[in-house]
Amino acid sequence: MSIIVTGAAGFIGSNLLQALNQRGETDIIAVDDLTDGEQFRNLADADIADYLDQNDFIERYARGDFGPVRALFHQGACASTLESNGRYMMENNYRYSCRLLEASLELGVPFLYASSAAVYGAGRTFREARRYERPLNVYGYSKFLFDQRVRRALPQARSQVVGLRYFNVYGPREGHKGRMASVAYHCYQQLRRDGRVVLFGEHDGFPAGGHLRDFVAVEDVARVNLHFLDHPQRSGIFNLGSGRARSFNEVALAVINSVRASADQPPLVLAQALESGLLGYREFPEALRARYQSHTCADLELLREAGYRDDFLSLEEGVGGYCRWLARSA
């Protein structure tokens, strides 16, 4: 039976392909939009059975052309929180997802999809309940609205439906995302290019570099997806973060100290990084002030109740491994 991955050439989709391959799974149909031809690089080292454009795929999938399908991992979306074209966002993220959900329910195919912590907006409670969901941008709204569609469908669903609300994911194969790549990625590139890291200054009551996010390694994200593949009786919407909020300063330090370790140099603390000029700040961008999440931290209670017991990589472990991967890939 085939496994289908949409967004397969993207960041999380391509890492999911790698995780499936490591299990010996190769009967995989990869689905994406390769208008940006450079993204083929995320597919080049994956073993797959076929590739389809996302527009060609959806009609064939709805007709049942692929025979028995073990699961559909729907990772494809426009992930830019800065995208202002609401019509494009809703068609690509909401309407396309609705069509896949409807077809999956009709075919009885387990449907595991990417939601986002962006649904929570500027709130301080990150629990999978409607009263805590107040998105700040149209990207967050597109994910929020699809989650509501799923909630209405779940009571009648006869096959698995799982939504995973990704928090701040970082790791290999995200370079194509440009401005939307992770803080860790941008810190590493700044350090290599400019010899220093520059973070946003104070905003929303948080000091310079002190904004807090739940940073989660993409390896952990892939593992949680596979957990639900292995437990098709589990359905619902679940947070997927590390369960810990860490500051941008801590990410920058993890990058700086990883690079220093590769040069056999001792680690620095924050004050030393600032004093040496390896870390600095710039004024917080005016354009982001009204739509910026200053703090996120996943409540993992429902995920743990769904049977996922593994520990998540610490920020230092995950960022350290990522920096070594970036160095090898340069």
Swiss-Prot record:
NADP(+) binds at residues 11-12, 32-33, 39, 54, 75-79, 92, 143, 169, 177. This is ADP-L-glycero-D-manno-heptose-6-epimerase. Coiled coil: none annotated. Binds 1 NADP(+) per subunit. The gene is hldD. It comes from Pseudomonas paraeruginosa (strain DSM 24068 / PA7) (Pseudomonas aeruginosa (strain PA7)). Homopentamer. Its EC number is 5.1.3.20. Substrate binds at N168, R179, H186, F200, G201, E202, H203, R213, Y292. Keywords: Carbohydrate metabolism, Isomerase, NADP. GO terms for molecular function: ADP-glyceromanno-heptose 6-epimerase activity; NADP binding. Belongs to the NAD(P)-dependent epimerase/dehydratase family. HldD subfamily.
